Amino acid sequence: MKKILLTLLMCLSFSLVAAELQIGTNFDKTVQVMPTDNKEKIEVIELFWYGCIHCYQMDPILNDWVKKLPKDVYFKRVPAIPRGEWAPMAKAFYAMETLGVSEKLHTAIFDAVHKDKTLSPADEKAILQWVTLKSGLDRKKVEDAFNSFSINATMNKAVQTFRASGASGVPTLVIDGKYITSSTMAGGNNEALKLADDIITNIRKDKK
C-alpha cells in the first residue's frame, strides 16, 4: 500500500511540473543545441541589453535568484546583439569584464541609462567616457579594452549565441543550451525564474 501511495505521489508531482511547462507557450527549445562551458553542470545564460527597461527591472530579481542557485548550476550573462545599435553596450559589458570592474559598474550602468537617464545605450563614445570616469581607470587602458581583438571575437560569439537561441527579445534565459524562456513567455519575471527552476529540475533528472 505504501509503495502504491508513493508511486501516486511521484506521478502527481511530475504532472504538476509537466502542467507548468508548456513547450511552445511558456518555454521553447533553442533553434540549435548550444555547447555549454561545463558539461558536468547545468548552464543558465541571461541574454540581455543594458538599454532594455525590462532587463533593468528584472536585474535585481535575477541577482537574488542567482545567489540561491545550487552547486550544480552556474550562471552567466551574454549581451544580446540582434542589431548594430546594441553593439556599444555589448562592448562595454565585455570591456568591464576585461578591466575587472563588472561587479562595481553593472548596476550603475543600468541606472545611468534608465534611472538617471544620463547615458545613451547607442553612443559608444559617451559609454567609453562613462566607464573611464566611473571605473577611475586610465582612459587609454579603457580604450584598449573597448577596441581589443579579443572583445571583438567574443562579441561575434555573442551574436551567434543570440541567433542559436531563437530568442525574439530580451531578457531571455537559455537553460543548458537547449531551452529558452522569458518574462514575456512566462507571464512575468518571477514566473520566468520559476519556470527556469522547473526546467533545471527536469534536466537534472535526465542527467542521472
How would you name each of these model-derived features?
Residues C55, E85-W86, S120, M155, ...:
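Alpha-helix N-cap/helix-start motif
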Residues I4-L5, L133-K208:
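C-terminal cap of thioredoxin/glutaredoxin-like
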Residues K3-G84, V159, R163-A164, T201-K208:
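Extracytoplasmic thiol/disulfide redox context detector
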Residues F14, A112-K115, S148-N152:
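A short structural micro-motif
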Residues K39-K41, M89, G169-V170:
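A structure-centric signal for secondary-structure junctions around beta-strands
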Residues Y50, Q57-Q129, I199-I203:
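Structural alpha/beta surface segment adjacent to cysteine/selenocysteine redox centers
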